[in-house]
Amino acid sequence: MQDRDRPTTAAPIDLGQVAAIIPVRGLERAKTRLGEALDPEERHALVEGLLRRTIRAAVATPGIRAVAVVSPDPEALALAADAGAVTLPQGGGGLNEGLADGRAWAREMGAAALLVIPADLPAIRTSELRRILEAARDHLAASVADTGAAGTAVTALVVLVPDRAREGTNLLLVAPPGAIPFRFGPGSRAAHAAAASRGGAVYLELAGPLSLDLDTPDDLLAAEAIGLGGPVVGQP
């Protein structure tokens, strides 16, 4: 059986052919750690608004060829289809298994790179995704120039946006889609960086607005402090 995490034969990296995957565990019971600040109905509205915003931002970003939502939740998939995303029903397993399904989809459609975008980033905007892709292209061009002068070649690129604690991964770009295995979970930032190093990938880490995710009441306060709280979460 083919290993879905195994890199394929190296090819020129084209960051104008990016597939985006948005993993969603579910809408009904999401973000229970926000229970001290939001009731179940408010949490549901928050998660739904963030998912819609994430899809809209990705669909409108130049260079992103297609956007898919992978989820075991029929409600999340219906929302995704309504918002214009491809839907990938997840049969089982956790986040990394769902992303492996997304990787297989990206390969089937011939994408040169895969962008993983969690659906809990209040600062998600097309402008932010464009900034990430532009920084990736600039870093890739500089690395290609450096390695070319040294007589070697760039075969893989990994770009990561860490969370505010610099422990988790808030956004991950991998080129080609199989450049590294997914290691989302506790300590994922270090795990992804180590995987990039072992695989000989060019690695770039970018902090910024997308380093804020919504997991705790303190995160909600941080979002509100920079004008991203309340109803704004559901707006484009």
Where are the language model's segments positioned?
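Acidic donor-binding segment of Leloir-type glycosyltransferases
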Residues: 64-86
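Conserved alpha/beta core of the MobA/IspD/sugar-nucleotide pyrophosphorylase nucleotidyltransferase superfamily
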Residues: 5-6, 12-13, 187-236
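N-terminal nucleotide-binding beta1-loop-alpha1 segment
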Residues: 1-34
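Short phosphate-binding loop-to-helix
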Residues: 79-113, 188
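Short beta-strand-to-loop acidic/aromatic patch adjacent to the donor-nucleotide binding site
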Residues: 112-120
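Short beta-strand-to-loop element that shapes/binds the nucleotide-sugar donor at the catalytic cleft/hinge
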Residues: 159-176
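Conserved donor-nucleotide/metal-binding helix-loop-beta segment in metal-dependent transferases, i.e.
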Residues: 124-164
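A short, N-terminal amphipathic alpha-helix
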Residues: 47-63
